[in-house]
Curated annotation (Swiss-Prot):
A Pfam family annotated for this UniProt entry: TRAPP14_N
Bias (Polar residues): 512-525
Phylogenetic placement of the source organism: Eukaryota, Metazoa, Chordata, Craniata, Vertebrata
Protein name: Trafficking protein particle complex subunit 14
Biological-process GO terms, alphabetical: cilium assembly; regulation of cell population proliferation
Amino acid sequence: MESQCDYSMYFPAVPLPPRAELAGDPGRYRALPRRNHLYLGETVRFLLVLRCRGSVGAGVGGGAGLASRGAWTELATSLAALASVSAGGALPGCGSAGDQDADPPGGGDPGGGGLFRGCSPLLTHGQGPATSGGATTLPVEEPIVSTDEVIFPLTVSLDRLPPGTPKAKIVVTVWKREVEAPEVRDQGYLRLLQTRSPGETFRGEQSAFKAQVSTLLTLLPPPVLKCRQFTVAGKHLTVLKVLNSSSQEEISIWDIRILPNFNASYLPVMPDGSVLLVDNVCHQSGEVSMGSFCRLPGTSGYFPCPLSALEEHNFLFQLRGGEQPPPGAKEGLEVPLIAVVQWSTPKLPFTQSIYTHYRLPSVRLDRPCFVMTASCESPVRTYERFTVTYTLLNNLQDFLAVRLVWTPEHAQAGKQLCEEERRAMQAALDSIVCHTPLNNLGFSRKGSALTFSVAFQALRTGLFELSQHMKLKLQFTASVSHPPPEARPLSRKSSPSSPAVRDLVERHQASLGRSQSFSHQQPSRSHLMRSGSVMERRAITPPVASPVGRPLYLPPDKAVLSLDKIAKRECKVLVVEPVK
């Protein structure tokens, strides 16, 4: 019987007519425009048309199968169909667009596109939560039976296909619904198989109507998403670039969000069924909430945002949170992120919008424990005295003394500048005069805040930075570790001219009191001991004599302070001409 029917699948590009119109005019579907591609994540409605070959009522094969109108009507009313979808093409290889758009080593032009990283899609689904597993909640409609054909309105969702699937294989299975025999209802198949042979039990079902129809359609991927993360004055900013690169149709961006990926905080399930948390990964707590990333408003940040073919749009987000870590916060907290983009096209006849989830690079929250901020009135007039207020927030450790030193003459130290750049920098340095270049703030206890005002005067107009050349000098007491058991003590009775004793005394003096200064540009850990304007380390405590006979040892030479725990915030002032 299956060979006596023709099968056709119609994917309309417009909403289907009402069921009553299709039943009254079954051939109306032929005039509907068809689609030649689909979108990953959308819900597709289509028609499977089963048509009887020849005219109903004429003898087919000597009266077998569908020889009469009654036989066709009986078969058509007992048919059922179910659609499924699977990946129909070879998945892309390991090299993806996200790998090609990775950050180049050594950075690049801050305004160039090379600093944007490609973000791979994780999941794409339609309105509402994505269906999981093999279960489906899509509606099943009864077929429309006409004189010589049966129309099956079918629905299939494309949200379970892997990201990057190039083609979708849609398979429709058609079978004849039969009423179970009374003996099957009474005894069940297990009892019948135990008392009869399988061939005798299923002989009647071998002649039942069964057919399977499939087609292959092109899948268009979601919009391309790229990401760039940077920090400005201690604020974590993220720029998301959305690009319509695969569709020639216009798409609309309805919403875009950045959320913490709490699922990445868990390790795989242990054999006993327990689940462990990753220590340095943010989990569901008060550190980073679902609303921590806020989209900053802009002149072009309205929704919906239309994107034509090959058009892109940028969205700016900021991580909102306290600059100082909360009590009990972990150092170097890593926050896995995902981006959710809601988009649509006018060619989605049955889906209002599609949601695509992208994997973003993680953000590491290295909050500084010692922060220097500055504020002043702006603008100011030339030759007018103005005051800059510096605030030191100390959550690092106790310091014996804190000093602010205005040292613009060291700005060019260690830099290879051309003549034009040197003249421009020198002109900028000569434009600002500090009335009190040396300021002693005294003792700073951990958890305290120091505020100090410094007077300046501007000699030229322009925009000037007032934190870069204000060097921060911190004096602290270095902890002296206990000598290891295998260390051999040295006595003062040794010869004063001994090189070992002289080296020991110098290093012991340096361990009692140390000073470090920090400029606006923070070096990396590998340059911790670099001399110059960035950081200086020297002994400031006079030599302290050791009692005769008391053993001395050589303390380990290690970095006492880590530069990533100290930060300085920019402060700029605009200098204008006086009003005449």
